[in-house]
């Protein structure tokens, strides 16, 4: 489904991703963790070509992402992305935010787009907010709208780039609950997060990155109880003892 082979990424002279080899299968939940500046977000953003790779090969859903001739919009239709900041249009209602892309990009009729939007608002637990504006919602509610918006395009893959890091502690749980439910339903998910409880409970595999490299890959029970890499041990001791 997602295949990185010897992927490198530079910003000028700065080597952000170093020889990345990673395969993510359909229906798998992969959580990427590591210290700030380790390249986690860049890696995820390469999947839908928000960032371009400098060398190597990246194949997503049988499409060579680094091929200049591909229809990038076609690729992105199959990939939902949820960022740290919700990026909702402030002048549109929740419903309008969710129906915009399906109507414009997929040419779905308005009635059907609204029904789909309501279905996903129900799924994320806020159907009563359909006619509210983003400014009337809490951060957690806005992030759940952003997830519903991503799902309304019926993607094959969902990418989450630190989806809870801008939220108040009391609203983090409601967003993680939605993500847990998605994982249970078999959505292919790539998640960058500092929420170790979520990673332990939901991930099929943990990918630990540091300084642009993947240092360790393991199932969560193995990674959290017995990490092999010294750098991973230090990271976990710092993050789990706070």
From Swiss-Prot:
Disulfide bonds: none annotated. It is a peripheral membrane protein. It is found in: Cell membrane. It comes from the Bacteria. CDD domains: ABC_HisP_GlnQ. Keywords: Amino-acid transport, ATP-binding, Cell membrane, Membrane, Nucleotide-binding, Transport. Residues 2-236 form the ABC transporter domain. GO terms for cellular component: plasma membrane. GO terms for molecular function: ABC-type amino acid transporter activity; ATP binding; ATP hydrolysis activity. ATP binds at residues 34-41. Induction: By lack of glutamine. Part of the binding-protein-dependent transport system for glutamine. Probably responsible for energy coupling to the transport system. Belongs to the ABC transporter superfamily. This is Glutamine transport ATP-binding protein GlnQ.
């Amino acid at each position: 489904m997602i295949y990185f082979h010897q992927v490198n990424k530079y910003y000028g002279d700065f080597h952000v991703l170093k020889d990345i080899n990673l395969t993510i299968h359909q229906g798998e939940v992969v959580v990427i963790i590591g210290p700030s500046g380790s390249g986690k977000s860049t890696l995820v953003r390469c999947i839908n070509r928000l960032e371009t790779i400098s060398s190597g090969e990246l194949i997503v859903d049988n499409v060579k992402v680094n091929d200049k001739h591909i229809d990038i919009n076609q690729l992105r239709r199959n990939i939902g992305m949820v960022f740290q900041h919700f990026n909702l249009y402030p002048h549109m209602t929740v419903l309008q935010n969710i129906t915009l892309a399906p109507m414009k990009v997929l040419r779905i009729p308005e009635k059907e787009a609204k029904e789909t939007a309501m279905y996903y608002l129900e799924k994320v637990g806020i159907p009563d907010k359909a006619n509210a504006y983003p400014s009337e919602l809490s951060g957690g509610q806005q992030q759940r709208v952003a997830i519903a918006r991503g799902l309304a395009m019926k993607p094959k893959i969902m990418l989450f780039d630190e989806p809870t890091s801008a939220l108040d502690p009391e609203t983090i749980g409601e967003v993680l609950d939605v993500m847990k439910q998605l994982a249970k339903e078999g959505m292919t998910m790539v998640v960058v997060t500092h929420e170790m409880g979520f990673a332990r409970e939901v991930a099929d595999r943990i990918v630990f990155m540091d300084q642009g490299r993947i240092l360790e890959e393991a199932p969560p029970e193995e990674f959290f109880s017995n990490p092999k890499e010294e750098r991973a041990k230090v990271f976990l001791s710092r993050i789990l003892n706070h």
